[in-house]
Design a protein with these regions (language model features):
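Short, polar/acidic, helix-capping and beta-turn segments at strand->helix junctions
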Residues: 33-36, 49-50, 54-59, 112-116
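Oligomerization/assembly interface segments of phage tail-like spikes and tubes
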Residues: 55-69, 116-127
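Small/polar-rich, solvent-exposed N-terminal microdomains that initiate assembly or binding
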Residues: 1-51, 81, 89-93, 134-137
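Acidic-leaning, charged glycine-interspersed low-complexity segments
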Residues: 19, 36, 84-137
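Mid-chain, well-packed structural core segment of small domains
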Residues: 66-91
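Short, cysteine-centered beta-strand-loop-beta hairpins and adjacent loop/turn segments enriched
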Residues: 48-51, 69-72, 127-134
Length: 137
């Protein structure tokens, strides 16, 4: 489910009408060659969140915005747009559904060379759509 969610999240962010105008790249990993600003999945981890009759996963995904500039308000506006887009992600995914999406934390920092980075972490809880666990081979 984690791989499915990561791919769906990147596709959802890329499909936003405004984000591609703000960012030069939205990539699952660090893009091989992209000028700032760009967005990547920095890390993800999953744990069991199964129910009595369905498999489930709790998946934490940290995405990182990389930008350049002296004005933190500009990077902050991009981070808010990203957070809003993630919160609006539709629940249906191939083979599972998102039960909920919770913002966990964000961290912003100024880096050398007028670079800025914002790490945004969300928790996704997913439930498998397929047949109940007791009916599985």
């Amino acid at each position: 489910m984690e791989t499915t969610l990561r791919a769906a999240l990147i596709a959802w962010l890329r499909a936003d009408p405004a984000l591609p105008d703000m960012l030069n790249d939205i990539h699952e990993e660090a893009p091989p060659a992209a000028s700032l600003p760009w967005l990547q999945i920095a890390a993800s981890a999953s744990a069991d969140w199964s129910m009595k009759d369905r498999r489930g996963r709790e998946i934490r995904i940290a995405i990182e915005l990389h930008a350049r500039g002296d004005d933190p308000a500009e990077t902050g506006a991009m981070a808010r747009a990203i957070e809003q887009r993630i919160a609006a992600m539709p629940p249906a995914l191939p083979g599972c559904r998102i039960a909920n999406i919770i913002f966990l934390r964000a961290r912003a920092e100024q880096r050398a060379g007028h670079r800025r980075a914002v790490l945004i972490e969300h928790r996704f809880r997913l439930i498998e759509d397929r047949q109940p666990m007791e009916n599985r081979p």
